[in-house]
């Protein structure tokens, strides 16, 4: 049986917003927002947090341990090796690559992408090329076999930092662009945590949505409030 595993790339280090993975949005850590939402997926077979073996990322590993979430620790300088190690640790076949600084990611979009992957003979299912979703909701799905190939063949800095980068560099790879429903096409909305102003905005959104919809509010709820 094919195993589809989400790996969440999470680091505490950030030049613009240090410690952002453990920042509270509406009283809940950023990482917890994302993990809780991904656990509501109906198509994922599991998830794992990929972080570094550096001391500064201990809070991420400690959080994962307390909450019973799988966590892989690898190189602090090689995101591709770290992502591959996490996926191999989970014995996956298909990779769903997620950034930890996207706390309000809607699992329904992930599930739609997995369904497209299952029905098509392609190397990548992505929303990232069309860029119609709010920033922080894009999904990329590809095979573990492809990730292993990239890890062996690609040593460019872009590839080692962004594991899906090689898929977009050659016409060799078969890419399917996932089209999302029109009511989700709000590309001007930024739901990524990268700066203090992002933290302030997302914190206000979290508080407003929590009051109306509860802590696991979805994208529809966010758009209604925004």
List the predicted regions and their residue ranges.
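Conserved donor-nucleotide/metal-binding helix-loop-beta segment in metal-dependent transferases, i.e.
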Residues: 106-132
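N-terminal nucleotide-binding beta1-loop-alpha1 segment
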Residues: 1-17
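Conserved N-terminal catalytic core of the sugar/cofactor nucleotidyltransferase
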Residues: 32-93
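Conserved nucleotide-sugar donor-binding
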Residues: 92-93, 139-151, 196-200
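Conserved alpha/beta core of the MobA/IspD/sugar-nucleotide pyrophosphorylase nucleotidyltransferase superfamily
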Residues: 142, 163-226
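Short, well-formed alpha-helical segments that are part of the catalytic scaffolds
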Residues: 17-40
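Acidic donor-binding/catalytic loop of UDP-sugar-dependent glycosyltransferases
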Residues: 79-84, 99-116
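Short aromatic-hydrophobic micro-motifs that form the base-stacking/packing surface
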Residues: 94-98
């Amino acid at each position: 049986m094919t195993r589809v595993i989400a790996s969440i790339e999470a680091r505490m280090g950030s030049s613009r917003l240090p410690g952002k993975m453990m920042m509270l949005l509406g009283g809940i850590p950023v990482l917890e927002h994302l993990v809780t939402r991904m656990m509501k997926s109906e198509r994922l077979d599991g998830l794992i947090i990929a972080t570094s073996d550096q001391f500064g990322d201990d809070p991420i590993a400690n959080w994962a341990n307390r909450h019973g979430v799988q966590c892989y620790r690898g190189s602090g300088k090689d995101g591709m090796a770290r992502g591959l190690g996490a996926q191999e640790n989970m014995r996956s076949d298909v990779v769903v690559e997620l950034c930890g600084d996207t706390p309000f990611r809607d699992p329904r979009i992930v599930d739609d992408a997995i369904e497209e992957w299952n029905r098509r003979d392609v190397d990548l299912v992505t929303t990232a090329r069309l860029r119609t979703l709010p920033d922080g909701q894009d999904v990329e799905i590809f095979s573990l076999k492809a990730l292993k190939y990239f890890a062996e063949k690609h040593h460019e800095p872009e590839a080692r930092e962004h594991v899906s980068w090689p898929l977009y560099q050659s016409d060799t790879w078969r890419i399917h662009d996932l089209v999302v429903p029109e009511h989700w096409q709000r590309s001007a909305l930024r739901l990524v945590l990268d700066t203090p102003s992002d933290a302030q905005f997302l914190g206000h959104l979290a508080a407003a949505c929590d009051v109306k919809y509860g802590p696991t509010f979805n994208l529809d709820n966010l758009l209604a409030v925004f």
